[in-house]
Amino acid sequence: STSRGLGDVYKRQMSGKAKNVILFLGDGMSLTTVAASRIYEGQQKGGSGEENLLSWERFPATAFSKTYNTDSQTPDSAGTMTAITTGVKTHMGAIGVSAGSRTDCADSLSKGLLTWLQLADSAGLATGVVSTARLTHATPAATYAHSPERNWENDTDLTEAAKAAGCKDIAQQLLSTSRYGRGPLVALGGGRGEFTTVEERDPEYDDKVGQRLDGRSLVQEWQQAHPQGAYAVSYTHLRAHET
């Protein structure tokens, strides 16, 4: 069959050592979503749709995984992405920490889990995070951050108890991941307001300002620490920084 022939081609191409590892994750991409996509693409090609195969359905191997949190049978993206990046199931809302309580910062400080991105970074490999969501959102954040509560995206989200116990907001953690190596060399996504202060007006939308109340402009801090780096706020700006 065509799919089997393509599978043989993939196997032949997989000989040798891999150059890159890319995890492509469709957040919320359930079986029904995949089925709808398969049918829609097939109909766009002029068929009835059911006979169509999406690109990854031609791979030589596919598998299913059971998704759940330690405290919920219907999971959220924070706990499930933590399971993907660390291999450990955890409570709903948790990012990069083992199971505990969403409100207990002090307890979570001893439950941090290493992600495969951090392991790769510590081995000297180049790493990066690309997302259509905010970089501080649960799914991308689970590659680099450690927090019992997914909603602690900037300093205004943390409770006073969490601040006193020593927890850091997720945006701040993106800048402090260098303890495992260099940290992500590429971070593309939304949510720049989580990194800027309420005194800073958005560079693209004049009616918006940052969200931080601690007076820290994390963007400026990163630029000062990495003068050789590039910060882009749009596609055009990004293309201007291409090397």
Language-model features, listed with the residues they occupy:
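A short acidic-Thr-Gly-centered motif at the start of a beta-strand
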Residues: 11-17
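Surface-exposed loop and adjacent secondary-structure segments within mature catalytic domains
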Residues: 33-112, 117-239
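Short, flexible coil/turn micro-motifs enriched in small/turn-prone residues
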Residues: 2, 21-23, 82
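Single conserved hydrophobic/aromatic residue that forms the stacking wall/gate
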Residues: 1-10, 237-242
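Beta-strand elements within well-structured catalytic alpha/beta cores of enzymes
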Residues: 18-30, 120, 188
